Amino acid sequence: MPINSETAAQYLTAAISAEVEYRNHTFRNGDELHKQVASVAHWLCGMSGKNSLLLAGGCGNGKTTFVYAMQNLVNHFGIKNQVTGLNFGISLYNAKDLANICKTHPKDWRSLMDKDILAIDDLGTEPREIIEYGNVLSPIIDLISYRYEHQLPTILTSNLTPQQISEVYGKRIGDRLKETTEIVPFLNGSYRG
């Protein structure tokens, strides 16, 4: 983003607050949120040295809300992609929906693999494999591998820890994510209850 990380943190906090209020909840500011915002803002400004981001933690503690806020923030700045001339955007998909798209809409699947910034919400909730006309497909493994090979920014949210992601998706995927992904822990409790 074309701003420093401190300014990005202020904008991101405002975007999170707006998203929380949009969902008819009360925004709660605190130390844990400040750490999360600072890490994500650092990543958004390209200062982390990693091209992908993992928001990992328990249920209901704000990971998806962060992604919606990032999506609104990136849209607000209207940053142009030098290759396409179009504005960058964050495309957000639920992991279960991605598995379904892979199976039922192959053309859409192919185009979303190349999205500027792809956000995968609830990594770990989707079926690991799907069968299509006798072919066994591993949509998320294939998607993460493709985006790794092409160095495309990917945002992941998950209730799984990085270690659990390695166990579920294999050592190779875990190692690739370790290399390319800034991990932001969400250690706070659920905001839902």
Short names for language-model regions:
Residues M1-G49, I183-V184, N188, G193:
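A short, basic N-terminal segment
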Residues S52:
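Walker A (P-loop) ATP-phosphate-binding motif of ABC ATPase nucleotide-binding domains
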Residues L55:
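Hydrophobic anchor at the beta1->P-loop junction of P-loop NTPases
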Residues G60-K63:
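Conserved glycine(s) of the Walker
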Residues F66, M70:
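Hydrophobic positions on the alpha1 helix immediately C-terminal to the Walker A/P-loop
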Residues N72-I90:
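Post-Walker A helix-loop "phosphate-sensing" segment adjacent to the P-loop in P-loop NTPases
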Residues T84-Y148:
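Conserved nucleotide-sensing/catalytic segment adjacent to the nucleotide-binding pocket
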